[in-house]
């Protein structure tokens, strides 16, 4: 722009997820996760989404908070290893069943072919729901105990997702517990 010197493209550091988190931050996040249970249900749901966005930010995953598209809401998204994950987050009184899993799968199928999903349910998933949901989907699942164990043991979120994705690719099972892969 004016002059003989060519314009240099802006330099951007390559995206890198954190492989470790300060143990003090993990403890604070773990305690905040526990404190969410004291909130009223609707307030707790929004607070849980905000908590997850902060967790993704701390882990260097370039999160996006919840957003609306025509006819649907996505609870958030993040990037990991050049993959975009769409988030479904629920904090309910009972484990998640097949209808919620299929509903989220439908959202993923309406996006780009390379889209992936992560369904984080504080209350877990029913065995019947997981069996009926089937195998070979582009969704992995986490429950509240997974989050607690990850934070309590100071395991980076990226490592948890990577191992869950690998296990899902190898077995077809969308849900494997953190304690079974670490």
Region locations from a protein language model:
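Mixed-charge (Asp/Glu-Lys/Arg
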Residues: 1-182
């Amino acid at each position: 722009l004016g002059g003989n010197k060519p314009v240099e493209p802006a330099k951007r550091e390559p995206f890198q997820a954190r492989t470790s988190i300060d143990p003090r931050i993990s403890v604070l996040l773990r305690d905040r996760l526990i404190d969410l249970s004291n909130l009223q249900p609707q307030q707790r749901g929004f607070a849980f989404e905000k908590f997850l966005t902060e967790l993704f930010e701390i882990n260097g995953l370039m999160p996006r908070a919840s957003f609306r598209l025509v006819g649907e809401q996505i609870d958030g998204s993040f990037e990991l290893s050049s993959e975009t994950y769409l988030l479904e987050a629920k904090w309910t009184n009972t484990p998640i069943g097949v209808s919620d899993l299929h509903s989220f799968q439908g959202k993923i199928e309406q996006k780009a072919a390379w889209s992936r999903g992560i369904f984080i349910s504080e209350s877990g998933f029913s065995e019947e729901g997981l069996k009926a949901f089937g195998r070979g989907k582009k969704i992995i699942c986490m429950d509240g105990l997974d989050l607690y164990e990850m934070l309590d043991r100071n395991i980076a979120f990226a490592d948890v997702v990577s191992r869950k994705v690998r296990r899902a690719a190898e077995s077809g099972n969308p849900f494997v517990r953190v304690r079974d892969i670490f």
